[in-house]
Curated annotation (Swiss-Prot):
Occurrences of domain tr-type G (ranges): 403-572
Name used for this protein in its record: Translation initiation factor IF-2
Biased composition (Low complexity): 178-230, 280-293
Signal peptide (residue range): none
Organism field: Xanthomonas euvesicatoria pv. vesicatoria (strain 85-10) (Xanthomonas campestris pv. vesicatoria)
Higher taxonomy: Bacteria, Pseudomonadati, Pseudomonadota, Gammaproteobacteria, Lysobacterales
Length: 904
């Protein structure tokens, strides 16, 4: 620093404002008038000394040395390990404790001495004062430890008293139980040894030795009891040598209990630790002592091993669950019952070869297999509670069984006169009411004749109504097989015989149309012999009646035969009580709602009864017979129409009358759930089969979507079966929706979404449906005869198939020799040996009957003239385009491609 340093420059060097520096110089006794005055070195040192005195620092090195002589610093460092609880495990942490203590000699002590002390004397004086301070700390620590010991002893005495009282109460309870057991036990024999006197004394609650023995904890021997006071003395002795503010022992003795207790609180002083110990009231935790945390039964700090039933024990064996599975169950529900994740169940199904999603339903067998695969037990769930109640209602129809009318089903081939025969019997014109003169419904009628009441079921004879005929044979008592004498046995005749035999129903053969020329009843009998239908005149048990439905010949004889057969069968039923029976036909009437034609088989069906019919239920609002009248009730073997159901039931469903609507609703809902689950399982299976089929067949198969609506349920079934049967490997008929009733807006929307054709069988579309049909260009067709439906669908399906390209060989030429031409290259000299070779048609070159080239002709000549065709037995020259490897002996095959319309 230069001697000519100004105050401003000095302020910049020491990083101090100029005004502040001027003030400090003035306080140091140096007056300056401005910042531009020069500061000498002497003035700088004087300012520095002033500032050091102000901040308590020595001005010179000598003063600093004397200042350092007045100060002594003691540094201590200790390493120890602290155990920290981290959840269920314990972690050991290394902790280093550093202590620094500085002693400064006061000014008063230095000024009171006459002469300065030597360094040894100063050190001795410092050590003496430290010892005095340590003694004061030890006395304070000893006082705190003594108060802690007194408090612990009081707590220990209180716990021992509580434990003794508890043991005495337990001993009294055991003594009372033993006394009660001894009183209830049989008297001992005379020579039994008497109990010792020590036993009653041990059981007595007043025994002086019982309380200490009971109070002694398990596993603690008498020899270990005196160890507790000894450890307490050790702790009190160690506390005498402990320094205030530190847990480290001065005399080399450590307080283990305090170290463990305050292991995580090293920052606390001894006074704070003593105060917290008093507030907590913890036991000392000495091993082997009754006040130990591990041995304390009432303390909160008990170990996990002694926690009793509140501790969690890890299961050592897998849990095997018993899973109740119904007919179907979703994968998610099965996973929930198995206490597994849905993905685990899906993986198990994949391993078994079943491709299913978590929301998909699987059947009982598949669910049971995957349950067993996962190590659990599958049992079948009992879901038949409502069904059992319904069965009990059906069996509750008690009463006397009386004779009932027979149920007769008229069966036979189409146009053999079944409805005309029934028409003559009823004296009505039923046949004229059917479209096309053929029966397309099951007609149920009961006729009162001179021989009693007879219920007739008229079934259709067309091949499409197989299910109707089977249903009619199932619920009938007698089958009348109508066979035309001029036609003989036809396919549906054989089918009707098979249905009757399968149902175990007696058969009566009515040979119709005997008034026609060419009628041959004997031929009918001989043809039926091949179907194991043997006439009585041939030694069999089947009645053959020759009738004419047109003129009425033999009708009375037929009725007599029916009555005779009914008497042989001895048909009986309970005429009173709850009704039960079968649905023959069902439909949806726009004015009346769902209408079901039922045949009562037991009991009496009355208006107001609650009815369960398949998945439908309801209260009978009205009953109608075939003439339109409303009877009060319908007994056994009487067909009636029922109004009031919740929906259109399936033909062939059974119905039962129940007491209340609640049971009817529960049964219907349970059946609907089962049917829906079964349908989901079937649809899932069909989807997988369709995927695999499409993978195998590629995209070549065409699909024709249909929406079918009919007037009755039986017609819907017949249409679905007949149309789906038209499917083949090239086209598939897919019925996306079917139902009973008129064509609604919902049906039209379904057809528009799937680009389907709507078929209305004896039904029409309403205004809203027609509007959607017109706006979307949907193909809507109305029919009244099932023949026309099948023919039209065949035509539409054939149009989807398109045309098939076929190849037809029109001529073959034999190569005799090969010539070379500069214009055409190799020219084959040929002889046409078959058909005609045309210039405009494609050709193939065959060598040893193997095709070696396919192309077209470039030239066809006859005597150097170009010709269009060469016929059989004529020589010609053929130039093959883009092929020069023609050899003698080859054959040139000429063919043409033609388009052929494909049909079903």
């Amino acid at each position: 620093m230069s001697q000519q340093t100004t105050i401003r420059k000095l302020a910049e060097l020491v990083n101090t404002p100029v005004d502040k520096l001027l003030v400090q110089l003035a306080e140091a006794g140096m007056k300056f008038s401005g910042p531009d005055q020069v500061v000498t070195s002497t003035e700088k040192m004087k300012l520095l000394g002033f500032l050091r005195r102000t901040h308590g620092k020595a001005e010179t090195s000598a003063e600093a040395a004397s200042e350092a002589a007045k100060k002594i610093t003691l540094n201590r460092r200790k390493l120890q390990e602290v155990t920290v609880n981290a959840g269920r495990t314990k972690t050991t942490v290394n902790v280093e404790v550093r202590q620094k203590r500085t002693y400064v000699k006061s000014e008063n002590e230095g000024s009171g001495r006459a002469a300065p002390m030597t360094p040894d004397e100063e050190r001795a004086d410092i050590l003496r004062k430290l010892e005095e301070s340590r003694q004061r700390n030890l006395e304070e620590q000893q006082r705190l430890a003594e108060s802690d010991r007194v408090r612990d002893e009081a707590i220990q005495r209180k716990r021992e008293e509580e434990q003794a009282a508890k043991d005495r109460a337990e001993a009294e309870r055991k003594a009372a139980e033993e006394a009660a057991a001894a009183a209830s036990a049989p008297a001992p024999v005379a020579d039994a040894p008497t109990p010792s006197a020590a036993a009653p004394a041990a059981r007595s609650p007043s025994s002086p030795s019982s309380a200490p023995r009971a109070a002694r904890p398990a596993g603690a021997s008498p020899a270990s009891r005196p160890a507790a006071p000894a450890r307490a003395d050790d702790r009190s002795n160690a506390a005498k040598h402990k320094t205030r503010g530190s847990h480290v022992m001065v005399a080399g003795v450590e307080d283990d209990d305090a170290t463990k207790r305050f292991a995580g609180q090293l920052h606390l002083s001894a006074a704070d630790r003593a105060r917290r110990s008093n507030v907590r009231g913890k036991p000392t935790g000495r091993p082997g002592s009754s006040s130990s945390r591990r041995g304390n039964d009432n303390g909160r700090g008990g170990s996990q091993a002694n926690s009793g039933p509140h501790g969690f024990e890890r299961p050592t064996a897998p849990v095997v669950r018993e899973v109740a599975i119904g007919e179907t169950i979703t994968v998610a529900d099965l996973a929930q019952k198995l206490a597994l994740k849905g993905g685990d169940v899906v993986k198990a199904l994949f391993k078994m070869g079943v491709m299913a999603t978590i929301t998909q339903s699987i059947d009982h067998d598949t669910a049971a297999l995957v349950t067993e695969e996962l190590g659990h037990k599958a049992v079948r769930a009992d879901n038949a509670d409502f069904e059992d109640a319904l069965l009990a209602h059906a069996e509750d129809a008690q009463g006397e069984a009386t004779s009932r009318p027979p149920v007769v089903t008229i069966m036979g081939h189409v146009d053999h006169g079944k409805t005309s025969l029934l028409d003559y019997i009823r004296r009505t014109k039923i046949a004229s009411g059917e479209a096309g003169g053929i029966t397309q419904h099951i007609g149920a009628y009961h006729v009162e004749t001179g021989r009693g009441v007879i219920s007739f079921l008229d079934t259709p004879g067309h091949a499409a109504f197989t299910s109707m005929r089977a249903r009619g044979a199932k619920i009938t008592d007698i089958v009348v097989l109508v066979v035309a004498a001029d036609d003989g046995v036809m396919p549906q005749t054989k089918e009707a015989v098979a249905h009757a035999k399968a149902a175990g129903v007696p058969l009566i053969v009515a040979v119709n149309k005997i008034d026609k020329t060419g009628a041959d009843p004997l031929r009918v009998k001989n043809e039926l012999l091949a179907e194991n239908v043997v006439a009585e005149e041939f030694g069999g048990d089947t009645q053959f009646i020759e009738v004419s439905a047109k003129v009425g010949t033999g009708v009375d004889t037929l009725l007599d035969a029916i009555s005779l057969q009914a008497e042989v069968l001895e048909l009986k039923a309970v005429a009173e009580g709850r009704a039960s029976g079968t649905v023959i036909e069902s439909s949806l009437d726009k004015g009346r709602g769902p209408v079901a034609t039922v045949l009562v088989q037991q009991g009496a069906l009355k208006r107001g009864d609650y009815l369960v019919c398949g998945i439908q239920y309801g209260r009978v609002r009205a009953l109608f017979d075939e003439t339109g009248h409303q009877p009060a009730s319908a007994g056994p073997s009487i067909p009636v129409q029922v109004l009031g159901l919740s929906g259109v039931p399936e033909a062939g469903d059974d119905f039962v009358v129940v007491d209340d609507e609640r049971l009817a609703k529960d049964v219907a809902q349970q059946r609907e759930t089962k049917r829906r689950e079964s349908r989901l399982v079937a649809s899932a299976t069909n989807r997988m089969e369709d995927i695999l089929a499409q993978m195998g067949k590629g995209e070549g198969q065409q699909v024709l979507n249909l929406v079918i609506k009919a007037d009755v349920q039986g017609s819907v079934e017949a249409l679905k079966q007949s149309l789906v049967a038209l499917s083949n490997e090239d086209i598939r008929i897919n019925v996306i929706h079917s139902g009973v009733g008129g064509i609604t807006e919902s049906d039209a929307n379904s057809a528009a979404a799937s680009k389907a054709t709507i078929i209305g069988f004896n039904v029409r579309a309403d205004a809203s449906a027609r509007k959607i049909v017109e706006s979307n260009g949907i193909d809507l067709r109305y029919f009244s005869i099932i023949y026309d439906v099948i023919d039209q669908v065949k035509q539409v399906a054939s149009g989807l198939l398109g045309v098939e390209i076929r190849e037809e060989i029109i001529g073959i030429a034999q190569v005799r020799d090969v010539f070379r031409s500069s214009k055409f290259g190799a020219v084959a000299g040929c002889m046409v040996i078959e058909g005609v070779v045309k210039r405009s048609k494609p050709i193939r070159v065959l060598r040893d009957s193997v095709v070696v080239f396919e192309g077209e002709l470039e030239s066809l000549r006859r005597f150097k003239e170009n010709v269009d065709e060469v016929r059989n037995g004529t020589e010609c020259g053929i130039g093959v385009k883009a092929y020069n490897d023609v050899k003698a002996g080859d054959q040139i095959e000429c063919f043409e491609r033609i388009e052929v319309a494909r049909t079903l």
